[in-house]
Curated annotation (Swiss-Prot):
SUPFAM superfamilies: Nucleic acid-binding proteins, Translation proteins SH3-like domain
One GO MF term attached to the UniProt entry: transferase activity
Biological process annotations from GO: mitochondrial translation
InterPro entries, A to Z: NA-bd_OB-fold, Rib_uL2_dom2, Ribosomal_uL2, Ribosomal_uL2_bac/org-type, Ribosomal_uL2_C, Ribosomal_uL2_dom3, Ribosomal_uL2_RNA-bd_dom, Translation_prot_SH3-like_sf
Record has Ribonucleoprotein as a keyword: yes
Record bears the keyword Ribosomal protein: yes
Cited PANTHER family: LARGE RIBOSOMAL SUBUNIT PROTEIN UL2M (PTHR13691:SF5), RIBOSOMAL PROTEIN L2 (PTHR13691)
Similarity field: Belongs to the universal ribosomal protein uL2 family.
Primary site of residence: mitochondrion
Protein name: Large ribosomal subunit protein uL2m
Signal sequence range: none
Keyword annotations of the record: Mitochondrion, Ribonucleoprotein, Ribosomal protein
Amino acid sequence: MVLNWRGVKSRLYSGKRRIDGRNKGLIAIRARGGALKRKYRYIEHYKQKWMDKWLFVMRIEYDPNRSAHIALCSILKEGIYFYVISVAKLEVGSLIITSNLKQGILQVGYTTKIKNIPEGILINNIELMENSGSKLSRAAGTSSLIIKQYNKKYSLVKLSSKECRLISNECYATIGTVSNIEKKIKKSKKASESRKKGIRPIVRGLAMNPVDHPHGGRTKGGMHWKSFSGKLAYNISSRKKTKMSSRYIIIGHRKQRLMDKKKKNG
């Protein structure tokens, strides 16, 4: 994909103050800091504002704040500009639309309600609740699969994490896969690439002192792996058991991955 960048629209970005993994001065996430300065681009996740209006893709740009590319769109004959997350195979000069038509034309980049999308279609930028803005499948190269219409209210969707979840038929989603699919294949060739992104070297817990890490000052074994804050790590679920949205999860991502492994092994 060729990126056509000619400067950022002044009303669509602002300065961004970096936190560098700190919370009130205390380290919340290790090995963060020292990244290049960035300008935050405002992304339009609520496309229902422009219902039944054709959007013209002016250019596709690189965004340092996210893994996916973004597309600068304008409403024809109105002079309104905004950014949206670009979809794979979306080209400069193409037209996209947000519509509720049940028998509308389904093309890459079109946004509509889940109930209007047939089974077996890949979607992205999915809403979790009605009119809440896109929340799921927004990273580079990700997409979700519509398995079937569960009932009149919900559809069964398989997310990129292999989790099978019920999502309301009234929620909006975009057809296609998020752009920059090559992100998973690309590897950093030198340390400076990671430092420019704000990723610093990570020191092993075993190499630290006991005051710095639970693994420090001792040999391996004798306890379960822990994080630097003392919480259990590796294969431990950190999700709240009493979370309200858990009732919409039909098959969790851990269970689904085990089922896929058994199918491969036969």
